């Protein structure tokens, strides 16, 4: 008895190609595009809303951020206010930032502030210190005039400065 085996052969087919014929041109009728419709998912709306609120809040904060930064201690290790002479507008905030890690404070000299200003009310308490780099003390000066400042632990080393409020 003989056995017959056949192998499966796959022949690729090409649609639209005909032997011995020129290609046909497609129909020229154009269908109007179907109108696109989409909806915004609630989570996307929330994300956009949050981004807009954050942007607006950032703009408000930036516009109100009229602050001058004064470093307590120089980058070279000097015991100084950097800069030591500061000019600000009335109502502007001065931010004192510990730059070096030495303990510092900011005191206003009661004899060298504009008349009617309570130096104790705008100074740090003498026993309070900014010990770590990055710690800050802020004060907003509203009265025009010249204010003398000093760091009580380093006053003897010359750590003093002036703020002029215009």
Curated annotation (Swiss-Prot):
Residues 1-67 form a transit peptide. Residues 68-166 form the Plastocyanin-like domain. SUPFAM superfamilies: Cupredoxins (SSF49503). Cu cation binds at residues 104, 151, 154, 159. The keyword DNA repair does not apply. Keywords: Chloroplast, Copper, Electron transport, Membrane, Metal-binding, Plastid, Thylakoid, Transit peptide, Transport. It holds the Pfam family Copper-bind. Disulfide bonds: none annotated. One of its GO terms (molecular function) is copper ion binding. GO terms for cellular component: chloroplast thylakoid lumen; chloroplast thylakoid membrane. It is found in: Plastid, Chloroplast thylakoid membrane. Its cofactor is Cu(2+). It is a peripheral membrane protein. Belongs to the plastocyanin family. Participates in electron transfer between P700 and the cytochrome b6-f complex in photosystem I. This is Plastocyanin, chloroplastic. It comes from Fritillaria agrestis (Stinkbells).
